[in-house]
């Protein structure tokens, strides 16, 4: 598995060489940030520039193309002003799931109200429900389904925060705090087939919308 600390040190060096003094915030998301990474895990990097242009994006892409593990690098890139005007229901998960490396997202998180968290839960459940139905009927893609289970995990995180005021970042820890139904979403049974896994996700998302 990737030595993420060594990789980040190299990444930061290249970022400083290419964009000296231009990065407002740098962070890590996803399984590496949660300490739950596997060999197949992506490297989810968050880079917020003071100001972002298409020329900056071109230069950043060229920088990424010269990095090790290029095929695993993904993440979020934005200008600071654009992020400060983002839909606040999206900012809840974005801020809570990001491990800061340089800078702070406190200014961004302060924009997120209780109502925004409720919207995050509702819109997340709506998106999972619709995509689950579409995938079951048309695509029938196991990778899409796996991605929807990940999306559902974020909804469960947000709902748990909404109910308790506590944000539990590690999914393995959250699984011990929620209902059996939610636990089966956080830890889907690898022995189940596509249809049964789709059915469990469909039922969970439907209940989130109607209860």
Language model feature labels by segment:
Residues 21-29:
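Short, glycine- and small/hydrophobic-rich beta-strand elements in well-ordered beta-sheets
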Residues 44:
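N-terminal loops that bind phosphate or other acidic moieties
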Residues 1-17, 21, 33-39, 50-211:
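Catalytic core of pol beta-like nucleotidyltransferases
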């Amino acid at each position: 598995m990737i030595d993420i600390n060594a990789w980040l040190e190299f990444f930061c060096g290249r970022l400083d060489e290419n964009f000296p003094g231009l990065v407002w915030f740098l962070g890590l998301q996803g399984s590496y940030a949660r300490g739950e990474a596997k060999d197949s895990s992506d490297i989810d990097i968050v880079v917020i520039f003071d100001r972002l242009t298409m020329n900056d994006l071109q230069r950043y892409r060229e920088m990424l193309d010269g990095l090790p593990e290029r095929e695993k690098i993904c993440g979020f890139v934005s200008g600071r002003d654009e992020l400060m005007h983002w839909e606040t229901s999206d900012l809840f998960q974005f801020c809570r799931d990001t491990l800061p490396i340089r800078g702070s997202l406190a200014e961004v998180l302060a924009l997120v109200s209780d109502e925004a968290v409720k919207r995050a839960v509702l819109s997340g459940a709506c998106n999972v429900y619709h995509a689950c139905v579409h995938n079951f009927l048309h695509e029938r893609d196991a990778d899409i389904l796996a991605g929807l289970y990940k999306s559902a995990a974020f909804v469960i995180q947000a709902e748990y925060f909404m109910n308790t005021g506590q944000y539990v970042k590690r999914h393995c820890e959250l699984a011990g705090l929620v209902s059996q139904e939610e636990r089966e979403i956080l830890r889907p049974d690898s022995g189940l087939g596509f249809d049964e896994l789709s059915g469990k996700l469909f039922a969970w998302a439907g209940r989130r919308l109607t209860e």
